[in-house]
Regions:
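A short helix->loop->beta-strand "cap" motif at the edges of active sites that frequently abuts
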Residues: 51, 88-90, 115-117, 220-224
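C-terminal helix-rich "cap/oligomerization" subdomain common to oxidoreductases
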Residues: 7, 68-71, 216, 296-336
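Contiguous beta-strand/loop segments that form the cofactor/metal-binding neighborhood of enzyme cores
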Residues: 172, 176-265, 289-300
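Hydrophobic residues in well-ordered beta-strands that form the structural core
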Residues: 55, 94, 119-121, 261
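Beta-loop-alpha module in the N-terminal Rossmann-like domain of NAD(P)-dependent dehydrogenases
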Residues: 49-111
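Active-site loop of classical SDR/Rossmann-like NAD(P)-dependent oxidoreductases
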Residues: 13, 280-292
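N-terminal Rossmann-like dinucleotide-binding module
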Residues: 1-48
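A contiguous active-site-proximal alpha/beta segment in oxidoreductase catalytic domains
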Residues: 99-161
């Protein structure tokens, strides 16, 4: 059985992730229509997959020959393509940046739940070969995590005006990092402490964000602590500085060892026996793994919305981290 797809946008990961994955999984997916505001990109993608171009995402979601909607780029649409797919009863795969206020995030979650459609948010760090192998090692060799350090360094583009798209991208990056730590920890955090640094000058832009997640119960600091940071303080015109001694994407100190991940497929870990290095280049690309998972969730008789709750909780944590910075205190987390 092939799933007939409607694509909303092509997004920044189109050439390297989504297009190759859809090509490789042509036995499971068939692209029937594309909605992309930039006409030239729409024409190229439509020609590539021999499909139609559609003027609006609502018309795309309403098509009878579309079984699922793949949102690859939010652009100015925001959550509207997701809601349109829910109204049309179509499954949703969301790779667009997730940046909604608390009320809107709650509304989107409720609308998806009421619609009864399958939903999956794209979190590629979860499905990276190195992450999956780390979960195996935690269960078999390294023991339970105690401390996690998750860092991201992104080149900052020079801008003269408001950078709304950058703000959405920055928030989405944090949402994905938070979800990654939740997944590796295997628990929900109970509190968050956030800190934001704003670059001087006009326009004012955030160039560094940090948060500390505590996974303990009543007594803080007694279980798992995760430190997450995302920096955009190095100009893109300094490529050598950006790539100089980059920190490990994720460092996990466990009961019986420590592990370092460099995405997508390099894992170095240490235990009492010494150093172990694993290169997992032979694993299936992340894009194929995620779309295969989406295919199974849509064709299964059991409805899957696990990604929905994961996305909602990660968004809530980032929002509460921003609140923590504004109020200057640690915030207890409530996901109701």
């Amino acid at each position: 059985m092939k799933l007939r797809l409607g694509l909303v946008g092509v997004g920044g990961a189109w050439e390297n992730r989504h297009r190759p994955a859809l090509r490789a999984l042509s036995d499971r997916f068939e692209v029937r229509a594309i909605c992309e505001p930039v006409a030239r990109r729409a024409e190229i993608a439509a020609r590539d997959f021999s499909c139609d171009t559609v003027d609006g995402f609502r018309a795309l979601a309403a098509r009878e020959d579309v079984d699922a909607v793949i949102v690859l780029s939010g652009q100015w649409f925001g959550a509207l393509p997701i809601l349109a797919a829910c109204d049309a009863g179509k499954a949703v795969y969301c790779a667009a940046a997730l940046d909604f206020d608390p009320d809107q995030a709650r509304e989107i979650r409720d609308r998806i739940e009421k619609s009864g459609v399958a939903f999956m948010a794209e979190f590629p760090r979860r499905q990276a070969p190195a992450t999956l192998r780390l979960k195996e090692l935690i269960a078999t060799r390294l023991g339970a995590p105690r401390l996690m350090f998750c860092h991201q360094r992104v080149p900052a583009e020079a801008r003269k005006g408001p950078a709304t798209g950058d703000a959405v991208s920055r928030t989405h990056d944090l949402v994905e990092l938070v979800d990654w730590c939740r997944y590796v920890a295997g628990y929900e955090p109970t509190s968050v402490l956030g800190l934001t640094h704003v670059k001087e000058g006009e326009p004012k832009e955030i160039d560094y964000e940090m948060m500390s997640l505590d996974f303990s119960g009543e007594t803080p600091g007694t279980k798992i602590t995760a430190q997450i940071s995302s920096g955009r303080y190095m100009p893109a015109c300094w490529p050598e500085a950006v790539s100089f001694r980059p920190p490990a994407a994720l460092q996990v100190a466990c009961e019986d060892g420590v592990a370092f991940i460099d995405l997508p497929s390099t894992l170095i870990w240490f235990d009492h026996a010494g150093r172990h290095m694993e290169s997992l280049e032979t694993e299936r690309p992340v894009g194929e793994q995620m779309l295969s998972h989406f295919y199974r969730s849509v064709t299964s008789l059991v409805r899957s919305t696990g990604g929905l709750e994961d996305a909602y909780r990660a968004m809530r944590i980032v929002q509460q981290a921003h609140r923590s910075h504004a109020e200057g205190c640690r915030i207890k987390l409530d996901f109701s």
